[in-house]
Amino acid sequence: MNKKLHSVSPESGPNSNLDLTPQLAQSSSAFLFEPKNIVPFETALGWQKNFLKNLIEEPFSPQAVWLLEHFSCFTIGRGSDKKNLLFEENNSPLPVFSIERGGEVTHHMPGQIVGYLVLNLSLHKKDLSWYLRELEQVLIDVLDLLGIEGKRVDGLT
């Protein structure tokens, strides 16, 4: 399979180690983080906040794609309506986390792979539509590698 995935590299600049080997830190603009075990949501959120802090302090540090599984929990985005939980938050059957992302309620559970992009978007176009289309193209390319046809629908992302 010689297909090349769609990619957009950030501008070049010095890299910092970020607990990577020096060779990887100097040769990578991004890396994949994929733990072997289930990661509690609150642990992953703490890791992401620390990684983001470092990315802000060292803007040309390697960026990351994290692929994780979480124990069962619910997350609620900034714009979410809590009535979409379908139960009282203080009487939840599972932990509930209000987090700094868009979107509605998400139920996470073992077996579900969650992808987090930890990127310095200031190194790319400051255009949400462009970013979403680039992300969409990466997913279309991955589907193609798996032998599944993916396509865009005009007006939707």
Give the positions of each predicted feature.
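N-terminal lobe of the biotin/lipoate ligase/transferase fold
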Residues: 1-157
